[in-house]
């Protein structure tokens, strides 16, 4: 339902994350087939792009399965997400993604945040040589987005998250139902428009 509702927003380029579970990116046959089904569903909903990633047990891009995912995406763009940063060799991984026909790779340069991996991101941009788009992401804010843009990346990903307090007036102190680690029971993650504007203003 969320995908269909998002598709109704005019002039929006819609990317859909395909990830069957949290944790690592080594998926079982059942999980892989779930990914194929979800890509088909995203296509039927009118998505412009799907975002996914799948690795082998030795920390390399699973080229065979990734090629199947790319083929399943049909005319949709395919972005390989930050599973890329978990590979044993990002330069080798980049070449693998080019071979299987990925449109784009999302990366923090193999570090926890893009600012930390900025030198590696710059190197990846050079190595890509226009064969695949490089998108920098993780830890992006108004104070560092210009530096990341200056690496020559094709795109920048950021979340601009904030916490919105619950409108509940009664808050049961005896039970935790929907709370997860790092997110209070009576709050939800939202988007901060001011943060988005501040980041975009740095790129003008």
Positions of the model-derived regions?
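Short secondary-structure transition/capping segments
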Residues: 1, 27-29, 62-65, 91-93, ...
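Catalytic cores of alpha/beta
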Residues: 23-41, 85-100, 124-130, 134-136, ...
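Short secondary-structure boundary/capping elements
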Residues: 31-34, 61, 88-89, 113-116, ...
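Alpha-helix-loop-beta-strand connector modules within alpha/beta enzyme cores
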Residues: 1-22, 61-82, 116-142, 177-204
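Short, flexible, glycine-rich and Lys/Arg-enriched loop motifs at helix boundaries
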Residues: 31-33, 163-188
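Hydrophobic, well-structured mid-protein blocks that either form specific transmembrane helices
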Residues: 47-103
């Amino acid at each position: 339902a969320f995908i269909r509702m998002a598709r109704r927003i005019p002039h929006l380029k819609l990317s859909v994350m395909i990830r069957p579970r949290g944790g690592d990116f080594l998926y079982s046959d059942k999980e892989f087939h779930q990914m194929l089904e979800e890509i088909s569903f995203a296509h039927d909903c009118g998505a412009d792009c799907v975002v996914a990633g799948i690795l082998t047990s030795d920390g390399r891009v699973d080229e065979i399965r990734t090629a199947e995912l790319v083929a399943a995406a049909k005319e949709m763009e395919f972005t390989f997400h930050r599973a890329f940063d978990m590979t044993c060799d990002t330069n080798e991984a980049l070449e693998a993604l080019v071979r299987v026909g990925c449109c784009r790779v999302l990366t923090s340069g193999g570090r926890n945040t893009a600012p930390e991996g900025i030198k590696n991101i710059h190197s990846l941009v050079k190595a890509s040589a226009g064969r695949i788009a490089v998108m920098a992401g993780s830890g992006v804010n108004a104070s560092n987005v210009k530096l990341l843009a200056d690496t020559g990346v094709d795109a920048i990903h950021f979340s601009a998250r904030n916490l919105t307090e619950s409108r509940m007036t009664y808050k049961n102190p005896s039970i935790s139902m929907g709370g997860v680690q790092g997110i209070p029971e009576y709050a939800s993650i939202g988007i901060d428009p001011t943060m988005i504007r501040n980041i975009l203003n740095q790129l003008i």
